[in-house]
């Protein structure tokens, strides 16, 4: 018998929970009820799952004892890789893995990418992204087939900075500063532009047809802000719930955008 005070981790292939729209993805609610009853002695159960090839932390208010880490793929998205494809997951996360440790009952998870070790984000100068979108012929094909997908070539994205922070956990704060002045940051669910041009556009070049599963693409850990200028550097700071600085880097603008973007 496992003592009720122990830290419990449950590993599954498919996510037990998913995002706000789909909640349980492939799992029937009755199965979650069974798991909840099975672990009723434990105050907290950490779920580790895969399948989705993306990085996502989820909780469900109906099942407060569980939290879940949807893990990225070590291959990125190997099923659709091509010669021009970086090792990326569909949400733009760099391919990698999570190292979990427990100290005094407290769980800690660290993301490790294959190529860049502890890299936790990618920042985009949306002026450069917009220029790419406006001038690429395959983007025009995509706009025709998928009018509801993000069109980063539009004026509304001018001077914006996007930060895909796949290390995000609840309580983390993403702050952006332009020449020392803070910018208003919002969390969005917009798709990752690098994954789009690396995977979706080459696929359209091969077979320009509509696929229902590609009609809506999101990244759950994307943050956006509009800068005051087009060229000033933007400092990125990430802190945890206690205000401890976790990461700091500077986005130098203009920053080139193409399939080799880092």
Which ranges hold each PLM region?
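Extended low-complexity, serine/threonine- and proline-enriched intrinsically disordered segments
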Residues: 170-199
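Short beta-strand elements
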Residues: 243-262
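His/acidic metal-ligating clusters that form di-metal
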Residues: 1-69, 98
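Binuclear metal-dependent phosphoesterase catalytic core
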Residues: 62-168, 172-179, 218-229, 233-241, ...
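Flexible, surface-exposed loop regions and adjacent strand-edge segments
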Residues: 27, 128-130, 194, 254
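A short, sequence-level motif marking secondary-structure junctions
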Residues: 114-117, 189-193, 252-255
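Aromatic sugar-binding surface patches on proteins
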Residues: 193-226
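Residue-level detector of high-confidence beta-strand sites
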Residues: 57-59, 185, 248
């Amino acid at each position: 018998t496992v003592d009720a005070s122990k830290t419990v981790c449950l590993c599954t292939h498919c996510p037990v929970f998913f995002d706000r729209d789909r909640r349980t993805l492939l799992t029937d609610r009755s199965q979650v009820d069974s798991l909840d009853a099975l672990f009723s002695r434990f105050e907290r159960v950490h779920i580790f799952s895969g399948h989705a090839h993306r990085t996502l932390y989820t909780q469900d208010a109906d099942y407060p004892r569980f939290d879940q880490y949807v893990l990225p793929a070590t291959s990125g998205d190997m099923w659709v890789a091509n010669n021009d494809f970086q090792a990326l997951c569909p949400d733009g996360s760099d391919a990698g893995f999570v190292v979990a440790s427990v100290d005094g009952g407290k769980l800690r998870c660290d993301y490790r990418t294959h190529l860049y070790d502890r890299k936790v984000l990618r920042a985009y100068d949306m002026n450069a992204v917009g220029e790419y979108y406006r001038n690429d012929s395959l983007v025009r094909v995509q706009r025709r087939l998928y009018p509801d997908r993000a069109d980063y070539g539009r004026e509304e994205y001018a001077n914006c900075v996007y930060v895909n922070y796949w290390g995000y956990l609840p309580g983390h704060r993403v702050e952006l500063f332009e020449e020392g002045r803070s910018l208003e940051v919002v969390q969005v669910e917009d798709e990752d532009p690098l994954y789009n041009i690396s995977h979706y556009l080459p696929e359209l070049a091969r077979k320009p047809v509509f696929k229902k599963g590609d009609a809506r693409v999101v990244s759950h850990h994307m943050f956006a802000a509009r800068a005051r200028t087009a060229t000033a550097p933007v400092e990125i700071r990430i802190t945890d719930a206690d205000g401890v600085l976790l990461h700091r880097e500077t986005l130098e603008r203009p920053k080139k955008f193409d399939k080799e973007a880092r």
